[in-house]
Amino acid sequence: MDVLVIDVGGTHVKILATGQTEKREFDSGPKMTAQQMVAGVRKLAGDWSYHVVSIGYPGPVLHHRPVADPKNLGPGWMGFDFRKAFGRPVKVTNDAAMQALGSYKKGKMLFLGLGTGLGSTLIIDGIVEPMELGHLPYKKATYEDYVGERGLERLGKKKWRKEVFDVADRLVAALEPDDIVLGGGNAKILKELPPGCRLGDNENAFKGGFLMWAEAPRSESPAGRAGPAVATKLRPTVRSKRS
């Protein structure tokens, strides 16, 4: 089964399909709607063959459907029929969860995605729990306001790096993971990593997208496992968005 993986971000939409060696991308931005995203993907992947679609979505997801419009994109994502738009079966998960799934090794792993915002996912013994930690209160705003793109632009790289260390330290102390992965496009700006952290490969978002359609054993539902190496269960934790 050939899979088309779509990684939707605040600045770019990146795609890769089974059997392809190079990803393709186009610009997104604060006005991009779900319909525009689909149109862009269909055009860019027009010469690719695929049977199913995985979408990494920058916001909370429940039962493979967005439950809130993304903070850094346009409107029209909630209730959008991706299956009808692509004409194929579609699974949607939080974008950080998709990259976390591709980064997971074992035990209890915390994934933090440093990009337009702050993506976050906890995986415990293969069970994937997407989270919205970026919207939790921090100092005078939220975690995302300090370590997301807005924080980087406002603070500058030196102060931003210090905030990343502080946020990582607080979340690690609260969640006590065995493994901490820092991913997202801005992770490369870090000169060094917080203690106990490893740098994630952003290509793992595509790996996670492929795993979403891996065949499940008979004892579990098709949505219940990501493959023989990782027992995954996509169970998004839905939080209301903070204004």
Residue ranges of predicted features:
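Glycine-rich phosphate-binding loops at beta-strand->alpha-helix junctions
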Residues: H12, L171-E203
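Short beta-strand scaffold segments in enzyme catalytic cores
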Residues: V13-A17, G59, L101, L118-I123
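Short glycine-rich, Thr/Ser-proximal phosphate-binding strand/loop in the N-terminal lobe
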Residues: D2-A39, I124-R154, R225
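Long, low-complexity, intrinsically disordered segments
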Residues: K233-S243
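Short, low-complexity intrinsically disordered segments enriched in A/P/G/S/L with frequent Arg
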Residues: S221-A231, R235
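Short glycine-aspartate micro-motif
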Residues: V3-D7, V52-S54, M109-G113, V181
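A short, acidic, amphipathic alpha-helical segment used as a generic capping/interface helix at domain edges
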Residues: W160-A173
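Glycine-rich phosphate-binding loop and adjoining helix at the ATP-binding site
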Residues: E25, G29-R42, G46-S54, G59-K108, ...
